[in-house]
Amino acid sequence: MIELAKNHLKKVLEVCGANRNCEYYPCHFDGQVCLWCYCPFYPCEDEELGEYVEKKDGTKIWSCMKCFWVHREDVATEILREILNLTKDKDIDEALKLLDNHELMLKIKDRVKAKYPNR
């Protein structure tokens, strides 16, 4: 394999696989898929996937600490499929602008969750 291909494959594996080189791995469970390290649905406010917790200053923040759903291979792959279908005819900036819509992202979450429920 040529060096450029190896370097690209390394990036893909770090993002799409279980990134055991990450200092926080595993943040949810061993073998998790790290594609959605930063959840595109945050905050989803779905009580099956997370909860509001109180910070030291008394304010509340959405916690995904107990969420395993987005890190399952089937779910992570389907989320990517949904996003790619929506953005296939757009350049990167257009795609990011489209996806920077929380309501749209939550609709994606709901479609994927209907197909792959939280277990």
Curated annotation (Swiss-Prot):
One matching Pfam family: zf-like
Designated name of the protein: Uncharacterized protein MJ0836
Record-linked InterPro entries: Zf-like (IPR007212)
